[in-house]
């Protein structure tokens, strides 16, 4: 892998599929000025500014960072990276991290509009008490393994997640599972029920006024399985689909090959 000045790249301690990308202090220092040119309101209301800060980030790496992260995402053997400042300081606050996530996202493509937040990104708090209509903001419940974009018409190719702040908590881990490491992938992806169209809806908080239909499993050009699934939103049409979803959920959650990250 080509060395990029100001950036450290190494494999995650628990999985060679995940690459850790750490921005050295000098890179972070040089990002402060171009990032401060736009406040979050400007980024939300003027889409071209998002590409401006993305270019500022890439320019600091001689345009090598964009090539690296795109190669990771497009390689099925990896497909995941964790990026952030090597050292956290007062300057790398929540606004800086939103801008960094924005820059990274726009080195990859154009994010889908988030109907829940009404912006190009969603931001929310996980609190001690929560009365919302999904597991998303509930502090004491595990969210089962899932993919994003199951209930919308837009194609969801990739996902950027950022933890902006953490206070007075324990836990807060993220669980991930690569399909090619999943013990039950071959059996379930080839099950004819998993290739039927399922109805996918969403609760009111998502602000989506339609439902979509698609199978849980499909296959890429090389015949390798792909999955689009979340446990909360499918509406099985019959016993066969309902039992398949239960079997799928159990098989995902019992996997011994999940990777846990903070």
Regions found by a protein language model. Give the residues of each.
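Short catalytic/ligand-binding loop motif for oxyanion handling, primarily in non-cytosolic enzymes
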Residues: 90-93, 169-171
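Short, solvent-exposed beta-alpha or beta-beta edge segments that form flexible loop/patches at the rim
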Residues: 62-68
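Active-site environment of non-heme Fe oxygenases that use a 2-His-1-carboxylate facial triad
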Residues: 1-61, 76-77, 124-261
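Signature of the catalytic double-stranded beta-helix
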Residues: 93-115, 237-255
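A gly/proline- and charged-residue-enriched helix-loop-helix capping module
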Residues: 102-137
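N-terminal, charged low-complexity regulatory/assembly segments
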Residues: 47-53, 72-91, 100
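A structural signal for short, well-ordered beta-strand segments and their strand-loop junctions
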Residues: 81-85, 114-116, 160-162, 173
């Amino acid at each position: 892998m080509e060395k990029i000045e100001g950036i450290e790249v190494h494999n995650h301690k628990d999985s060679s599929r995940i690459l850790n990308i750490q921005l050295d202090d000098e890179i972070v220092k040089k990002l402060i000025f171009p990032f401060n040119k736009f406040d979050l309101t400007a980024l939300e209301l003027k889409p071209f500014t998002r590409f401006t800060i993305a270019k500022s980030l890439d320019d600091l790496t001689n345009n090598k960072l964009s090539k690296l992260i795109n190669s990771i995402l497009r390689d099925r053997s990896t497909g995941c990276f964790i990026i952030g400042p090597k050292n956290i300081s007062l300057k790398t606050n929540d606004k800086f991290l939103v801008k960094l996530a924005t820059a990274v996202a726009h080195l990859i493509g154009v994010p889908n509009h988030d109907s829940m937040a009404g912006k190009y990104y969603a931001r929310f708090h996980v609190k001690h008490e929560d009365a919302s209509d999904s597991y998303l903001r509930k502090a004491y419940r595990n969210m089962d393994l899932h993919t994003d974009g199951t209930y919308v018409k837009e194609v969801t190719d990739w996902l950027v997640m950022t933890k902006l702040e953490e206070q007075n908590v324990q836990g807060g881990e993220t669980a991930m599972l690569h399909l090619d490491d999943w013990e039950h992938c071959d059996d379930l992806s080839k099950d004819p029920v998993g290739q039927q169209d399922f109805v996918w809806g969403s609760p009111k908080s998502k602000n989506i006024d339609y439902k979509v239909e698609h199978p849980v499993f499909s296959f890429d050009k090389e015949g390798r399985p792909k999955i689009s699934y979340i446990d909360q939103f499918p509406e099985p049409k019959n016993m066969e689909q309902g039992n398949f979803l239960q079997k799928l959920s159990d098989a995902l959650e019992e996997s011994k090959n999940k990777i846990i990250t903070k």
